Amino acid sequence: MSYMDRIMEDPDIPADAGISIEFQIPLTSKRIDFIITGLNEVQQEQVVIIELKQWSSAELTDKDALVKTRFQHGVSETAHPSYQAWSYATLIKDYNQTVRDEQITLTPCAYLHNYPKDQIITNPRYEPYITEAPPFFQSDAGKLREFIKKYVKYGDSKDILYKIENGRLRPSKQLADNLVSMLKGNQEFIMLDDQKVVYETALSMIRKASADKKQVLIVKGGPGTGKSVVAINLLVETTRNRLVSRYVSKNAAPRAVYAAKLAGTLRKNQIYNMFGGSGTFYNTPANTFDVLIVDEAHRLNQKSGLFQNQGEDQVREIIGAAKCVIFFVDDHQRVHIKDIGDSAYIEKTARSCHASIKKLELSSQFRCNGSDGYLAWLDNTLQINDTANIRLSQDDFDFRIFSDPNELRKTIEDKNKTNNKSRMVAGYCWDWKSKRNPEATDVNIPDFGFAMKWNLEKDGSTWIIGENSIHEIGCIHTCQGLELDYAGVIIGNDLRYENGKVVTDVTKRSRMDSSVKGIKVGRTPAQAAQLAEELIKNTYRTLLTRGMKGCYVYFCDKPLENYFRQQLELPQEKAKVVSLPEPQGPRIEREVNDDVKYIDYLPLYTLKAACGKFGEWQQAEEEGWIKTEGMGKLTSGMFIVQANG
């Protein structure tokens, strides 16, 4: 700060100008290095935002608004200083009603006091941000003084800093209107059936919520039930209603992908400010947000921060930070040892926070070709849950097994040519060597000469929609919560078939995989083995349900491949079933009078289920009514369902 002290030693900079160092922006954990407030020559309120950097050099990147520079831990990508300063000013303008109402002018810039001017920071690719927030360099102390004096002529006699810190928080109409216009007509975010029920229920709870009447909605749903579709619609609608809301997720990938899809004409920072990680609420004042929409809530942790040493409980902290919280959760997608956010724990925590709680379930299946049967078959085959879905038909879902990983890759690449919505993914059984050595490959299967790199840092969290990322292989962290048309899955040696059992082997995971690190600490061997089995099987269940139209698989363990093949319906079996004559069924009435329901008639459901236990996400809908005879007294709990087997 000594550099700024020297800058401010100018008689024409008013001594009573407002100064703030390390100012924390409301709604965020972001801090502005240096702020100067005052009035310009016509008595208008002014705020100069200065981003300070100690850098002495930087490198270009091919990513928007990013440069590379050296930190203590080495060279890494970071935001361009002008982008940072501009983004802070934009965030305040977008969400501070007082700043907008009183027309307080925010003027950002950057000061790199150790940096000799070159063609990197001022490169034309950064021009949009340099125009908004000019950078000043080692030799520009005089220019920075003139810049400050241009905007701050008189001292701060109007408590401008107080208005920024304590002003009314409300998203701007421009931000809301732009967001709504981007969602309109976007087929990807149209809600159907029970998605609409959850959406309207959530809005009703949001309207009821207040600081002393917290509302918590817990929405359970399996893969492809549209949890994220509802979440994004709620984010847009609450912003349209000028409520302070945010989409929250533990993983960066869903945030980055949905933000990119919604960006449209908005500048990147404006849309990204509406998305945040789950580890930023441990010091957020109570009820700062009107609404927090938590997607993939099963991934929430206890501790936050890079070293997991901040905060106490992300579920409790999120509930405390908002008047209303909507949690979207799938209890079968816990894939990390530190994941705590199952529905039971969320409900228990919400009760301890004295919140009003409602629970709903999304059941309609939009992924996996709309087949609940595929999910139930998968649970049965992975031996997660016993269901009656022993065999899988190609009519249910396009599931194929490949004996050669190269053929699998070629098939996925061919599928991807249509719309860039097919990718290869794998279990984390291979070290990420290419992170340090760009020439190295990661996922290697020597018997077939197969070699691919894990998803590179180039696309980062948006790997799944990257233009050229088809040539890289993704892992659970870059695809969970997102969907593809076709998923090519490589199942590593951490999942095997032995003695009639699908077994897991945590020792086959990469040593770089943090999801199972420390699994033996504080647990008996049996407890550790049980948890490892749950995490590994949940990981593959998640990978195997990313494809909406098809899933193609290669197994490193050949006994496991043979076992999976045995669970597929053979073509001759299918032909045998199809050749049977259609039985004459009873007459189905579309509707009957209420006075004969459950007296003479029982409801018929559409689900053609195997006899036995149904999968958790298998749902039935009423198709009509059938008259019954010889069954004795009927009750309202009875129904008719067509069964195969």
Predicted features and spans:
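Signature of the SF2 helicase/ATPase Hel1-core->accessory helical subdomain module
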Residues: 293-362, 499
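C-terminal accessory regions
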Residues: 326, 472-476, 480-574
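Conserved helicase/translocase motor-coupling segment
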Residues: 231, 336-341, 355-374, 383-501
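Short, positionally conserved secondary-structure boundary motifs
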Residues: 576-644
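Conserved RecA-like ASCE ATPase "motif II neighborhood" in helicase/translocase motors
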Residues: 264-320, 471-474
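Conserved lysine of the Walker
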Residues: 227-228
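Accessory nucleic-acid engagement/destabilization modules that flank
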Residues: 1-163
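N-terminal pre-P-loop "Q-motif" helix
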Residues: 172, 187-215
